[in-house]
Amino acid sequence: MDSIGENILEKGLLLLGVELDQSQVKVLLAYLRLLEKWNQHYNLTAIKNSKEMISKHVLDSLSIESYLEGRRILDVGSGAGLPGIPLAIARPGCEFVLLDSNAKKTRFLFQASVELGLPNISVVSERVEVYRPSHLFDTIIARAFAKLVDFVAQAEHLCKPRGCLLAMKGRFPQDELEALPASFEIVKACSLSVPEINAQRHLVKLRPRRAGDH
């Protein structure tokens, strides 16, 4: 990752309003270099261009940083560590669990957490619907889950009673929102502006309804 890439990243962070110190920026760049290296052999992401990785992976991940709640965060289907690793770098005071059922991907996630020196990351190789942690989560994130109704059905047992689910989507998922069960309320469904990305990006924030909520 050259100085041009570093400039693109720093400019993007400024536009997103995400404040990181120089050491955090260096860890983000080290993550991208590691991802490029592993991607040559393990096909972790279809994006090969380093400049595209900055925008479509790192900046896209950090576009939801301000929506995180609490200290205990779960990244469902983390894959190559997106959005979990960039968010863990930005939020060192939070505890992140990166969950993926693909052993090849969890090997990369574990290696990345060690090489990047990220003690706030734990990696779990498990399917979300059978994952049973000892403690529930304040925020559960999914970046590439097929449908909202499936995300809710498979992850709701992991959410604290007043926690939230964050679903990162492309186009506005109107049909998916209408199909959601009454047990969850839609807190927010908004567009995201990600530097260097022209495609539509949206975020849906959901919360479990309490008894008596209407």
UniProtKB/Swiss-Prot annotation:
Give the EC number(s) listed in the UniProt record. 2.1.1.170
Enumerate the catalysed reactions.
guanosine(527) in 16S rRNA + S-adenosyl-L-methionine = N(7)-methylguanosine(527) in 16S rRNA + S-adenosyl-L-homocysteine
Sum up the protein's function in the record's words. Answer: Specifically methylates the N7 position of guanine in position 527 of 16S rRNA.
**Which protein are we looking at?**
Ribosomal RNA small subunit methyltransferase G
Which CDD domains does the entry mention? Answer: AdoMet_MTases
Q: What family name appears in the similarity comment?
A: Belongs to the methyltransferase superfamily. RNA methyltransferase RsmG family.
Question: What is the species listed in this Swiss-Prot or TrEMBL entry?
Answer: Nitrosococcus oceani (strain ATCC 19707 / BCRC 17464 / JCM 30415 / NCIMB 11848 / C-107)
Q: Which InterPro entries match?
A: rRNA_ssu_MeTfrase_G, SAM-dependent_MTases_sf
Q: Which Gene3D superfamilies match?
A: Vaccinia Virus protein VP39
Superkingdom as given in the UniProt entry:
Bacteria
GO annotations of cellular component type = cytosol
Q: Which GO terms describe its molecular function?
A: rRNA (guanine-N7-)-methyltransferase activity
Q: Name the keywords, alphabetized.
A: Cytoplasm, Methyltransferase, rRNA processing, S-adenosyl-L-methionine, Transferase
Q: Which Pfam families match?
A: GidB
Task: Identify the residues that bind S-adenosyl-L-methionine.
Answer: G77, L82, V128, E129, R143
Q: Where in the cell is it found?
A: Cytoplasm
The gene that this protein is the product of is rsmG
